[in-house]
């Protein structure tokens, strides 16, 4: 039965070619006069994108300060540095130029700049209630995290190797500028990591204990089919505007809540993946594809019909037996990941196969020392997470 829900998606989406030139206008519409720009590596500089955005701000007489250098698995220490600079500048809006790492960092800065005197990690760890944040705007350059429309952000505390998320509608971006052509220059690995992340944001909403939610199911299944088709096209030709457009829009819809309305989300694989990202600095999408198959084989027997439905609706598997269809669906999903040259076990990543004590340590961190259960399809503690890591711990 569909559960009660509240859907709030206030982000203004400006989608299409050359839309980055509208950044200044969108900021001006909000009555903002001082912007703090946040971005990652040199690609936004080399491509001329940053200059285009600055020009659009200049045309609207908007002053700005900037902070570049955001890294994948965005660091808490860097966000703290941004908070200090944004406060000193008197920023009124944080504008992220990049992918999920830049956007999540911007969200962290937006929280900190609106709450001077309180460390942002206090909000992340629920020690302080978040009541205000500066507005955030985004110019998307990587289709992946969906942070351009979501109410969540993830940062990593390098000192403790703790990768954690926060969720609040206060940090949903005011606008998202989405030009698929900006993704043409992505390294292939970034493209495929992003595709996996998009896929996982929906599949981890799809496998939950709540049934009888037809429209949400159809939206989720349609998104996954669309992504699978266009992933192959984009992998062959990254300048296929239609394919890159579909992938970019899938990324936003996959993580703005729509593919999981009326039911709880699982996101246990994200918990597993976050530990791999925090400890070994592995790419987020890779950590997800590396553990999903092991999770699926661990739980599918609890609801073979659900996995079989996924196999029939998403992979068009023509098999009447539910168990055979469920197993085939898991195999087809892993084949999809491998077709993108993404890992399907820990040994496929640079971290390699790990000793038992490392697996137990990560399982413990993911469950706060076995003090909480995670997931929704099956609630799990430290022991179960360790077993899934163990299943994935091979070459």
Q: Regions from the language model: what does each represent?
A:
Residues 20-23, 46-49, 76-77, 101-107, ...:
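Short glycine/serine/threonine-rich phosphate/pyrophosphate-binding segments
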């Amino acid at each position: 039965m569909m559960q009660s829900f509240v859907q709030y998606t206030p982000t203004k989406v400006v989608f299409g070619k050359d839309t980055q030139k509208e950044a200044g206008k969108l900021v001006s519409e909000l009555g903002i006069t001082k912007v703090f720009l946040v971005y990652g590596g040199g690609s936004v500089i080399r491509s001329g994108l940053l200059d285009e955005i600055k020009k659009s701000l200049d045309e609207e007489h908007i002053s700005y300060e900037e902070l570049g250098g955001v890294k994948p698995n965005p660091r808490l220490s860097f966000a703290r540095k941004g908070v200090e600079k944004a406060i000193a500048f008197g920023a009124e809006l944080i504008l992220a130029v990049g992918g999920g790492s830049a956007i999540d960092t911007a969200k962290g800065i937006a929280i900190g700049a609106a709450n001077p005197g309180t460390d942002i990690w206090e909000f992340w760890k629920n020690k302080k209630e978040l009541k205000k944040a500066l507005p955030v705007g985004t110019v998307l350059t990587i289709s992946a995290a969906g942070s351009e429309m979501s109410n969540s952000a993830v940062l990593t505390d390098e000192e403790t190797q703790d990768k954690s998320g926060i969720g609040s509608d206060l940090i949903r971006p005011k606008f998202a500028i989405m030009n698929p052509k900006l993704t043409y220059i992505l390294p292939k690995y970034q493209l495929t990591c992003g595709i996996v992340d998009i896929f996982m944001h929906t599949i981890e909403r799809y496998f939950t204990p709540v049934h009888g939610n037809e429209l949400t199911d159809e939206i989720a299944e349609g998104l996954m089919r669309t992504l699978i088709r266009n992933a192959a096209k984009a992998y062959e030709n990254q300048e296929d505007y239609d394919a890159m457009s579909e992938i970019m829009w899938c990324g936003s819809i996959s993580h703005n809540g729509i593919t999981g309305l009326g039911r709880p989300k699982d996101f246990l694989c994200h918990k597993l993946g976050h530990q791999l990202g925090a400890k070994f600095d592995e790419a987020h999408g890779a950590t997800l594809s590396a553990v999903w198959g092991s999770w699926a084989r661990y739980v599918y027997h609890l609801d073979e019909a659900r996995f079989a439905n996924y196999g029939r609706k998403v992979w068009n598997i023509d098999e009447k037996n539910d168990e055979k269809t469920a197993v085939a669906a898991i195999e087809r999903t892993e084949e999809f990941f491998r077709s993108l040259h993404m890992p399907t076990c820990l040994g496929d990543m640079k971290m390699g196969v790990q000793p038992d004590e490392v697996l137990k340590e990560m399982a413990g961190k993911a469950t706060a020392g076995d003090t909480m259960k995670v997931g929704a399809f099956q609630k799990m503690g430290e022991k179960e997470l360790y077993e899934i890591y163990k299943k994935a711990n091979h070459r």
